[in-house]
Regions:
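A generic structural-conservation signal
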Residues: 143, 361, 438-439
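Short, charge-rich, low-complexity alpha-helical interaction segments
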Residues: 307, 393-400
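Extended, charged amphipathic alpha-helical segments
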Residues: 5-8, 12-15, 222-368, 402-425
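Structured, mid-chain assembly/scaffold modules that mediate subunit interfaces
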Residues: 71, 77-247
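Long, highly charged low-complexity segments enriched in Glu/Asp and Lys/Arg with interspersed Ser/Thr
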Residues: 404, 436-447
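Extended, non-catalytic structural segments that build the interaction scaffolds
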Residues: 20-24, 38-46, 59-87, 287-299, ...
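Intrinsically disordered, low-structural-confidence terminal and linker regions
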Residues: 1-62
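Short amphipathic alpha-helical segments
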Residues: 122, 126, 135-147, 299-307, ...
């Protein structure tokens, strides 16, 4: 991959806070939810009744996508978006991985030449300036949004805006962006298809830089300049499947069939629950015991119907009524709910067990403290192994644009579940002498 060296120094015409407010107001108009709805339309079988929602998924489409995933990555991405909104299990899985990185678990290390010593004032200024920028970035919120999209779609493209008002990452439509290289720090760069803005020129005009310069360059030659490099200081790109820069495939696409099956079972259970509370109550008009008489009612039918109508008006929606001269019992439409619940529970466990991680979401299968600690360490490593180094690389590159002599940011390999354990270990290790402390620091990732 070619290294990206270009840098644009243009200042955005809007503050980060203004752009954030504008995006939040207009998100529905520029978001990808319409594409998720389109994926739903493709998965619904139009030949079947829409009242039977548990039978509307056309898995043939999914099988077609899975035969050649690289060629169907846009369809798979749209399907992933739909399942994210449709399946609570899938949403939990995405959020579980996205929240594994604790952006507050970091060390800020001033750069000091041990041989020459350091200028105390410069070191303190570097440390303070770096902390000031980090404190103003609201990393926990902005990066969480990026991580969610990355785990759902494999790649996140964004434009970062930073000034005294704060820091905001504007998501970029992945259908109009693609990874094209990497910086020397290790994080990814991308190019953007500027033809997208022929339908969103108001967005270019309102946001200003870097879009203004990029769109002007595109207009000068719409063929050769269609793909524009996102300027360095604005470029944010995270990718879960870091082993393949070119094809963005949802990390959990192999679970899509199981997730659709689980959604089917949940819909079936909803129908069963409704049927289980449904009852049919009968009002029988008593007959005379005269064996020779026919239709000899002891109550006048007109009077019976008058009271029957009053009775029907007082019934809730899930209870029906009938008036008949034939004796009938109360009819119920129960089902084996326990079996249905077990089916859903087992299907949910199957999704978690085959996800490759997220063992804690199926904690009933974990027995004992040792097993729990092992499971969380595995889940943590799985969720952070690609995104944590990219986060650290991006932060250090971004700081180089904002601080003249930035300190180095080291992201710690921990999660909300293991932070307390790490603090205890660091306190214990701090009591050792300098030689041992240096070795321990190396093991902890410091140098």
């Amino acid at each position: 991959m070619a290294q990206i060296k270009s840098k644009v120094s243009s200042t955005p015409t809007r503050t980060a806070a203004e752009i954030k407010e504008w995006y939040e107001k207009n998100e529905k108009n520029i978001s990808n939810f319409a594409k998720a709805q389109n994926a739903l339309k493709q998965l619904v079988d139009p030949t079947k009744s829409t009242t039977r929602t548990y039978s509307t998924f056309d898995k043939t489409k999914l099988r077609t996508y899975m035969k050649n995933p690289p060629a169907q990555y846009k369809n798979l991405r749209n399907l992933s978006r739909y399942l994210y909104y449709r399946s609570s299990v899938y949403r939990r899985l995405i959020w579980f991985n996205a929240t594994m990185i604790d952006t507050n678990a970091r060390a800020v290390i001033p750069i000091i030449d041990i041989n020459k010593g350091g200028d105390k004032a410069k070191v303190l200024k570097s440390y303070y300036d770096t902390l000031s920028v980090l404190n103003n970035m609201n990393l926990a919120l902005e990066f969480l949004k990026a991580y969610i999209i990355a785990w759902r779609e494999d790649v996140f493209f964004g434009m970062a805006f930073y000034d005294d008002t704060g820091y905001f990452i504007l998501p970029v439509d992945p259908d109009y962006a693609k990874v094209n290289g990497a910086y020397m720090t290790g994080d990814l760069s991308y190019v953007m298809d500027m033809s997208y803005y022929t339908r969103h020129e108001d967005m270019v005009e309102w946001i200003g830089e870097p879009l203004t310069s990029m769109y002007r360059q595109y207009q000068s030659n719409t063929t050769e300049n269609r793909w524009q490099q996102m300027p360095d200081e604005y470029c944010v790109c995270f990718k879960v499947n870091i082993d393949d820069y070119e094809i963005p495939l949802p990390p959990y696409m192999n679970l899509f069939n199981s997730l659709i099956n689980l959604a089917d079972l949940e819909d079936i259970q909803a129908v069963a629950d409704e049927a289980n509370i449904y009852k049919l109550v009968t009002a029988t008009i008593p007959l005379s015991n005269d064996q020779d008489g026919v239709d000899q009612f002891l109550v006048d039918p007109d009077t019976a119907i008058e009271y029957y109508n009053k009775f029907v008006d007082s019934l809730p929606d899930y209870i029906a009524a009938a008036i008949t001269p034939i004796p009938l019992d109360v009819l119920t439409f129960g089902d084996d709910q326990a079996t249905d619940v077990n089916k859903i529970e087992n299907a949910t466990k199957t999704v978690f067990n085959t996800s490759g991680g997220a063992q804690l979401l199926n904690s009933s299968s974990i027995s004992g403290t040792t097993a729990w600690q092992g499971a969380i360490k595995f889940d943590e490593k799985y969720a952070t192994s690609s995104l944590l180094p990219q986060t650290q690389a991006y932060l250090n590159r971004f700081l180089s644009y904002q601080v003249s002599n930035p300190a180095k940011v080291k992201m710690l390999e921990t999660s909300p579940y293991t932070k307390s354990t790490l603090k205890k270990e660091l306190l214990e290790e701090a009591q050792y002498g300098i030689p041992n402390a240096l070795v321990i620091n190396n093991l902890n990732g410091f140098n």
